[in-house]
Every structure is written in C-alpha cells, then in structure tokens.
Amino acid sequence: MGKKYVYLFTEGNGTMRELLGGKGANLAEMTNLGLPVPQGFTISTEACTQYYEDGKVINPEIQAEIMEYIAKMENITGKKFGDLENPLLVSVRSGARASMPGMMDTILNLGLNEQVVDVIAKKSNNPRWAWDCYRRFIQMYSDVVMEVGKKYFEELIDKMKEEKGVTLDVELGADDLKELALQFKAEYKAKIGANFPDDPKEQLMGAIKAVFRSWDNPRANVYRRDNDIPYSWGTAVNVQSMAFGNMGDDCGTGVAFTRDPATGNKGLFGEFLTNAQGEDVVAGVRTPMHISEMEQKFPEAYKKFVDVCDILEKHYRDMQDMEFTVEHGQLFMLQTRNGKRTAQAALKIACDLVDEGMRTEQEAVLMIDPRNLDTLLHPQFDAKAIKSATPIGKGLGASPGAACGKIVFTAEDAEAWKARGEKVILVRLETSPEDITGMKASQGILTVRGGMTSHAAVVARGMGSCCVSGCSAIIMDEANKKFSLGGKEFREGDYISIDGSTGNIYDGIIPTVDATIAGEFGRVMAWADKYRRLKVRTNADTPTDARKARELGAEGIGLCRTEHMFFEADRIAAFREMICSDTVEEREEALEKILPLQQGDFEKLYEAMEGDPVTIRFLDPPLHEFVPTEEADIKKLADSKGKTVEEIKAIIESLHEFNPMMGHRGCRLAVTYPEIAKMQTKAVIRAALNTLKAHPDWKIEPEIMIPLIGDIKELKFVKKVVVDTADAEIKAAGSNMKYEVGTMIEIPRAALTANQIASEAEFFCFGTNDLTQMTYGFSRDDSGKFLEAYYEAKIFENDPFAKLDQTGVGLLMEMAIEKGKKVRPSLHCGICGEHGGDPTSVEFCDKIGLDYVSCSPFRVPIARLAAAQAAIKDGRN
C-alpha cells in the first residue's frame, strides 16, 4: 500500500499536529471527546510538501485518495457529492501546525451549482437560504481560489441593496439573491474568461490547490520568518461537511474564547450572529451580539456550548478560541485552538492556570512567547486607533514600541526641537555614532538603509526607543529636508507615526498608550529565574541603561562599548586632538584630558551595578568615525592643534578606508596606538579601586575585553600593555583587587585557534554581529539590499543578523568553547551580539554550554524567560 495522505477525523488525535496541522488535529481530538463536530477528513501536510515537489500539482494518486475519502464522508452523512437528490456540501479550510494569519481564507458551501441549489431549495422549502449559500460560495471561491477581489462582489451587493431600498444583506429575498448569484457568475466570467466551475470535484481540487498555494504567499512567508515557522512544515487541508447558520432565525454562528484574550480574565468572551455564516461575525457586516445574549435566543444550544467550553479548556489546559454554528437550534463545533492573546493576558492566564491547579510552574513558563514581553515594556498604539489606520510604508521592525512625532532630519534638530518641548521622529538615510544625542532626544527613529543589527537598530534597542529601519521605499531629499513615501511628500515638522514591532509607518498622529507591568510579570519572571541555568547580562554604556537593565533583572554588564563615551561633547574635541597628533607625547597629552572623564563614566557604571560583573570593551570602531565633517568643527580642530585646515583635511582623508569594518579598528588600534589601551586601562582600574574603597563589601573585579582578536600574538601584545598598566595602578593603591583580561571572539580565525587564544584570555565573549558578518562575508549594513531576494528564492528563511545561524556561526562557537575549555577549564564564555536577546538563539547558547547571554536592557526579560524555557525543554529540572 502507498503512503497515506488523508485521514478521517475519527482516525486522528490531538498529538498529530505535524501531520494533520493544528486545526485537523483538534477536530480529530474534539471528535474523540464525543463533541458535536460535523464530520470530514484532513489532507496531511505531507500532501502539501508533495504538491510542491510535483511542481505545484496534486498528483493523481493523492486526488484518487481524496475522492475515496469523499465516498467515506458520503457513507457517514448519508448525502452524496454533486447529487440531485440529497447533495453533500462541504467547507474547505487551511490548517498549518502553528496558527498562521495570512493563510487561505475559508471556503463554505462547496459542491453547489444551479441544479443542486434548486434541489436544496425544494428539499428545505427555503429558497432564500439556498441562493444565499450559492452567492456566498461563488464570492468565496472567486476571491480565495481564483484571486478575483472581494470588492467587485461587494459592489454588486451594495448596488442590489440600494435598488431594493434595504441596508442589510439579510433583508434581500430569494429572488434578489438568485439574481446576485447570476451577476456574480457573469463577473467571474468577465474577470477569468471562463465559466464558473459546476463540477464539484473540480471545485474541490481547485480549493485544495489554493490552500497549498497560500502556504507560499508573501503574507505567509513574512509571518513565518517573524515567528520561526519553517517553510518545510507545509499546511494541511480540512474538508468538513457543512453545518448551516444561515437557514433562518433559529440558526447562527459565533466565535468565542474561554477567557478574555486582552486581559486574561476568566469567563466567556465572544460574539454571535443569528442567520449568518462563517466570516459574517468577524467581517463586521452586521453588529454581532455578545455571546451571553445567545442564552435568550438558543437556551439549549447555549447550555451545551458552556459545557463544551469547560470540557475543552480542562482538556487542553489552556485558553481556547472556538468557532461554532447553530443549525435549527443544534450546536456544531467547527474549530478549537489555543487562543492568541496579548502579553498581559498571557501572563495572567499562565498564573491563573497554576493557581487553578491546571498547570505546573514549568508548564506556565513554557506557555509564554518570550518575544511578546517586548510589548509590555514599550508604549503601544491605541488598539482602536491602529485598527482603522492604513500604513503608508513598511520597513523592518528593528526596535519595538510605538512612536509619534514631528519629522526632523538631523540629530542637532532633534535636540533643538526637543529642547523647546516638541516630540520628534528622527528620519535618516542611516545613523552613525555621532547621531546618538539626537536619537536620545527622539521618540523614534526611521532609517532608509540598514537591517535589524544596523547602528540605528542596536542603539535604539539599547535605549528602549522605537526604531523602523531599512524602509527602502522612502525617496530622501536631505538637502531640502523632505522625503516622499506612499505617493505623498513629507516635510520637516509634519507628523508621522511608526511601529517598531511591525515596521509599519503611518501618516499623521496615532495616539499611544504607555506600557503597564502588572504583578503577574514579576511572578512569571521569578519562576523563570528559578529554572534557568544561563546568566543574563546587559549591553549598557550609560548608568541610566545599566540601572534600567538591573531593574529588569540583568545580572551584570556583558558589554560596555567605550566608544559611545567618546562622542560626548566634553571629550570628542580632546579625542580628535589625539587622532590628529604627530607624536606619542602629543597623543598622551590629549588622552590625559579624557582619562578623568572616562574614569568617571566607569565609576558610575560600577555604582549602578552594585558589585555585579562589568565587562568593558576597549575602543573598537575605526578612527574615521570620530573625525569632524562640518567645516566649523574642522576649523576648531585646526586651531586647537596649531595646524592649517588643509593639514587637518589631509589627516581626515588619510583615515578613509575602502572597507572600514575590516580595517583599522578593534585591537589593531591598540597595536598602533598602545597609549589608547593604556589610558583606558587606567580609567577602568582607577574607577574600580575608587568604587571598592567606597563599597568594600561589593565584589568589584573588572573584566577588560579586547575586541577583534584574530591572532594570539595580537592578544599577547595588547594584554601586556593592559597588565603592566593595571598591575602598576593596583600596586600604587596598595590593593590586591583582582581583574580579568579576555577577548571578543568575532573573527572566524579566533574561533579556529581558540585553544591558543585561551592560553592568554581569561574569558571569551562571542560578538556574533561581527562573527556573522565575517563568516558569511555579508556587510550587516548592506545585507538588507539582497536578503529579500534570498527569502523569495528560499535560500534563507531568516536574517542571520537577527537569528543566529546555528549550523555555520554556531559551529564556530561550539568549536571555540570546546577548544578554549580544554586549555583553560575555568574559561567563562558569553555572547554579547544582538542575538543574546533572540529566544531561539538563547536556546542554542544554553545547549552549547555558554555561561551567560548579554543583550540590550529591554530584552533582558525576554532572555531570562527564553533561558528558562531552554532549561525546562532540556529536562534539567
């Protein structure tokens, strides 16, 4: 016997999600529970995969098996497909393993043609219902299978209602609906160039194909990418005998949740509509009634429904989202699934289910999607306002939250406008470190270029600001302070609203609501901390960021980028003097001005972290990022150095590099200018000694991290400068304070020679942004230009800068840990790239034995929860 592709509901169960999809598995499970489910069958996800393997056709064997199961349905129902005495009508629905918005809409009443309509009209003595079913079927099939837009049919309905002087669809009579059905068929022929199919088998195969096709539509692909759903899963198709909610006033249809999906409060929440079918409830054609009103209309069916809700919630031990139909007072269940919910509701439901004895703490931790916690920590758009808003463009949702403000085009303007009380959105082609003060002053940041790990994205996430990056549809005119998007021109001072979670951009003002964290958040986080192994640190460069991260549960700083400190107004001038100096003495003199300021920065960080570990990365970016670009600043620098403007411009020109990300940066700066490493070491050690003196009970052990090491000899050279300087400072202070010198692993060669590097490094920290960039040979700032094409061609399913590439980059990490720990068993390893806040990447870090992950402050709760889930899934508690 060949492979089985089709299963009756009675042949499946709730554990078969991979094969039957979520909807099919749940229909089978409800059947097994003895609930009133219209019977049918599920075509498996493997049939979908086969459809694509066969070149997007349903092969004859699978078609034959489907028709064999139609015959089985005929036996169960006593009706026949396409029959002119007792015809069988079916619905066709998609159903992937995970709930997938954007997949194909439902098709109802399949199996109808004009002859069958006449039969059911006579048989039921209800011609209005019969023609209503047919016109709905033509509309759904045309829209969903043949992609003839709904609007053409809606226009015909509106015209008919106008002619008849009525306002609701239900007020149209049988003759009106018959006329509409004929108009719909004519519209179909005009658009498609062929007659509407009358053969039920042709209709069925067309609908099944449409479900398979929808697995690969652009909406589904984007949703899959955002939610880690592999393309290889495929979707199942459910074919179910019809239950009719549109046969009269003793019929109806509804959607309900066993708890409120917005708040998590226990109690039935949903809507119901009499004499209606399928999508009518959610389509908003008529105003539905609250589910509680169903009790007056259909007391028997309502009582049964309340019992079913109770059975299903207890069975699945989770909040259920259900669809049902009432036909002549009799209840039929069409679907159940774990309901989608807000982050706030997810926390409340998880806690309540533990209190009700339905779930253990570990199970409750596993119920919550870590990524959804983002929405708890940032402002969001008002739910009603956003529902009626239409985006004018879309970029990448690079840093969550919602923001609304007046457009400005420079960091200086952002600061100036904020100073006078304006709320602004900073719009840039791309951002650079010198834009930081302007980014801080803005409600949100919008960039034309750059990906999920671009400068704008990383900095915005660190600050907890909203950011949409890489909106390449924007046509920028910086000189005239304007841009165009979505066919409209926007000037400085115009209002726009941006959503950093979805990447959507809106014209005008959309009101926002502040984030609220309820008591359940703390409770779930306490459970997460109880079960996780991985430590969670933060990437923070300022005391404000550090304090925020600590508040959100960070256990130390895994990355302090010292370069951001150089951009402050009181020190950039001195640093520029250092860059333009001719001798070591001149450079040391300029650095001496920065030393007390940098020391002060570090003292504040140590104070904020109260004895938790602090890892400080020495200067990383190339020097050209620090030099002035404005004429006035160049003149100022020339005057301070006693040089001509031309000489300064020549120095600036000499710093230009063809490939700066692989150029004169990281440890290479410390090799060329050891005095920079010396000054930074003094600042770190003096700050630590002062903090220790003020708080002798704190554990202050500085961790100094050398970036971009590719060769053991580089590390030896820089480490000697650090150790000689640090030891002298500690000795002079009469202290015995300990410190560590470690390295970033961000060049593939460092991972490959990790055994050598571990002989000098006391800790490894994986800088996965650069490691990904160098392993793939992609520039992270330019990859957005071609990644879309890679997604379409199915080369990539995810952005490797947002989700760690476990097979390539991950292999290098595993290798480095193994080699390093062989040489130095006490070696502690962490990750401080943006991947540290991505749940699937955190799970991988747990699996390969990292000691900690470090991420931006607002991602700390996400990492804590993801780390707990990784440990629980691994069965370590």
Language-model regions, residue ranges each:
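Short beta->alpha connector loops at strand-helix junctions that form conserved
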Residues: 41, 448-450, 469-472, 560, ...
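Protease-associated
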Residues: 358-442, 504-510, 521, 525-529, ...
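Nucleotide/phosphate-binding sheet-loop regions of phosphoryl- and nucleotidyl-transfer enzymes
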Residues: 1-389, 422-425, 432-437, 443, ...
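Glycine-rich phosphate/ribose-binding loops and adjacent secondary-structure elements
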Residues: 329-332, 429-440, 444-446, 452-458, ...
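C-terminal domain-closing interface element
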Residues: 334-336, 491-539, 545
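Structural motif
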Residues: 238, 408, 425-427, 446, ...
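Conserved alpha/beta-domain cores
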Residues: 93, 517, 527-877
